[in-house]
Amino acid sequence: MQEQYNPAEVEAQAQQYWEEHQSFNVIEDPGKEKFYCLAMFPYPSGKLHMGHVRNYTITDVIARYQRMQGKNVLHPMGWDAFGLPAENAALKHNTAPAKWTYSNTDHMRNQLKQLGFGFDWSRELTTCKPEYYQWEQWFFTRLYEKGLVYKKMSTVNWDPIDQTVLANEQVIDGRGWRSGALVERKEIPQWFIKITDYAEELLNDLDKLPNWPEQVKTMQRNWIGKSRGLEMRFDLQSPVGEFTSFDIYTTRPDTLMGVTYVSLAAEHPIAKYLADSNPALAQFIADCKVQSVAEADMATMEKKGMDTGIKALHPITGEPVAVWVANYVLMDYGSGAVMAVPAHDQRDYEFAQKYHLGITQVIAPQNGETIDLSQAAFTDKGVLVNSGEYDGLDFNAAFDAIASTLEMANKGRVKTNYRLRDWGVSRQRYWGAPIPMFNLPEGGEIPVPAHKLPILLPEEVVMNGVQSPIKADPEWKKDELDGQYVERETDTFDTFMESSWYYARYTCPNFTDGMINKAAADYWLPVDQYVGGIEHAILHLLYSRFFHKLMRDEGLVSGDEPFERLLCQGMVNAESFFIKSEGKENWIEPENVVIERDDKGRFIAAKHKITGDAVEFGGVIKMSKSKANGVDPESVINQYGADTVRLFTMFAAPPEQSLEWSDSGVEGASRFLRRLWKAVEGHINAGTPGKLDAASLPQQQKDLRRKTHETIQKVSDDYGRRQTFNTAIAAVMELLNETSKLSDRANPQGLAVEREALEAAILLLAPIVPHITQALWIELGNSGIPLNQPWPTLDESALVRSTIEVVVQVNGKLRGKIDAAVDAPKELLEQIAVQQENVQKFLEGVTVRKVIVVPNKLVNIVAN
């Protein structure tokens, strides 16, 4: 056996073996229990980062462990390849998005192989290829035929100079990222899928997911946002054009008697009508259109409004109330109109304070406390006051009474509402799957028939950064159907479409007769283990659940949910440093910083390695390009090997917690692997083991054997139930320490016990460090590779102890430890304990008052 561990050589050999034997390619096997393990597939940005490495290492470890459990494991990989970054990169590098994307997938595939991930590459998917997106196009036409797809006017970010639609991330401080023009909110026709038809099922089925993090389920519940409220009609005092009333939805009808004004969204039809004859209002509405509609921004921005001059009538009292247009009311929630109760809603309160509008208290705390409305709104539920016949009612009673009054007057009804909006899938970009609809010359549109699919996206294009090449090319739009001229839709799909069903296509990636091969899908689905970041908790995971239900209702898949168990891995963090210049933070790569630390390793001061300038500590934050604190996985692999990177990422923290990158931690992982190598080398050089005779072992060998099987027991639980791989690694490290203490290695029995311990350690570590364990397994003379071995089996008899360690205390403080026979009598334990030299030291000159003995655990001598 080679004396020194050479990671590059060991890893190349293992990877070559897996490639030649197609070790990870699988097919359906009805006679075998399946396990489908999946990591969220990456966007092919060009290079793997440490976040990718952590995600895919976790998934690979789980997949390999399940393989060793004897299961038929599907562990695929592919590329979420459409999207705006490819367009931006193509412009920057003067190339076509397709060429840039395919070049990146080639490079990243090699990086993934270099890390030893056991993917079934025969199932590789690339979502920008027609053989993938053609089925998405087909499915969209089916949804259209079922009435689940519709087109409506929708507001977008419009760049008036570039004459194009901008994604939210392309709007920087209200201006277009490229032109610098003030961005407008503009209405254009867009395609939507009716996710709201499935809102109730999406909400209820979260209860079918016991193995999902509660945090993710809560986020989805809040996003779906089911609420019970009252929809009511406010009549206008005088008609406004064709409008005689408008509807309002509220979840707090108990506050209705405190309404002092109502607010309309800038896009409300009544506001638009009034703006035609009111230039000041038209200007205010135009200003609203350039503001952000992101919830976080809406919450903190200044509340602004304009009195329209018209009045609405309170639905119960008939009193006239002012109608305002306000920038904090959104058209796409409820009805685009809200009743304003400044005393009991903070946004309404701030607005009323600014514009000197009435504030009427109608809710009082249930405990009779007084409230100070000069400071803030009282937003809790309570008891009604100043509300006429409803005074004294609590929230529930008031809800029912007011609902009853309005229903009898035909002015309102109880309604369940959802915060969830229908999914807008149109994007006015080029690099996406074309939406399969034809526009007819006489108006209207029809779905592209199956025989004309796929609608191909041209890949050889020139990007000008302004308009989508397919929108700019009049020839691309032209098509014919049954001899009639039609025009293709030039919008493309939201890229969340591709990632909403890829998990199902992995079960049959080369199936040409349809979107999904149901037999294959029924064998493999649901995904048993899904791994990905919590940032995908809402959109991707909600859309995937929705798509699964759509595919189920089309007869393509079975079951209600796509992912059985979800693990959201934590972020990879690292130290960050910057130099402040002209109020701006210029981030510095850690390798260019000289750091002074205290004896506990904490930061004291730092300076730039080259310039000597003082450098500030930016904290331990998420690795990112913008903060210059990323670590290139390739450089670490080149220095230490892939197994070291894998071991460190699994050992540094439990998978769902943040991991702090540490060079010394990486060095420690490398050191452990070298120790493991040396332990096996030393064992081989010591001679040939005999056949293990467990019944006749001396005590030290029994102890090592017990440690081996305790480790198997613990590590099996850590891998399977707990998924705490860091503690599994720690347990194997302990086992290796115990193995190194074995003094009797000269006889075949001693070597047999050591062999059992080393082979167990190798198999237990094999999912985490697959290259070195494969090399060591073969060096020990075993046939096959660890991946194909059964998981180590626990020998319960080896756990039985003849002796046990008992702690000895004097007055509750640890003063010694003794080895005693299991279940030794109390008197014997007491006798042995007081004879310990260190214990006697603490008993000099004192009187023993009593001795407390806990069998098999502890002796505590109480003395004074």
UniProtKB/Swiss-Prot annotation:
InterPro entries: aa-tRNA-synth_I_CS, aa-tRNA-synth_Ia, Leu-tRNA-ligase, Leu_tRNA-synth_edit, M/V/L/I-tRNA-synth_anticd-bd, Methionyl/Leucyl_tRNA_Synth, Rossmann-like_a/b/a_fold, tRNAsynth_Ia_anticodon-bd
GO BP annotations listed: leucyl-tRNA aminoacylation
Main location: cytoplasm
Recorded superkingdom: Bacteria
CDD domains the UniProt entry points to: Anticodon_Ia_Leu_BEm, LeuRS_core
Chain positions of motif 'KMSKS' region: 622-626
Positions occupied by motif 'HIGH' region: 42-52
Name the record gives this protein: Leucine--tRNA ligase
SUPFAM superfamilies associated with the record: Anticodon-binding domain of a subclass of class I aminoacyl-tRNA synthetases, Nucleotidylyl transferase, ValRS/IleRS/LeuRS editing domain
Family: Belongs to the class-I aminoacyl-tRNA synthetase family.
Sites where the protein binds ATP: K625
Keyword Transmembrane helix: no
Coiled coil: none
Keywords: Aminoacyl-tRNA synthetase, ATP-binding, Cytoplasm, Ligase, Nucleotide-binding, Protein biosynthesis
Gene3D superfamilies cross-referenced by the UniProt entry: 2.20.28.290, 3.10.20.590, HUPs, Isoleucyl-tRNA Synthetase, Domain 1, Valyl/Leucyl/Isoleucyl-tRNA synthetase, editing domain
One Pfam assignment: Anticodon_1
Location of this chain's protein in the cell: Cytoplasm
GO MF terms, alphabetically ordered: aminoacyl-tRNA deacylase activity; ATP binding; leucine-tRNA ligase activity
UniProt-listed PROSITE patterns: AA_TRNA_LIGASE_I
EC number: 6.1.1.4
Catalytic activity of the protein: tRNA(Leu) + L-leucine + ATP = L-leucyl-tRNA(Leu) + AMP + diphosphate
Record's GO cellular component terms: cytosol
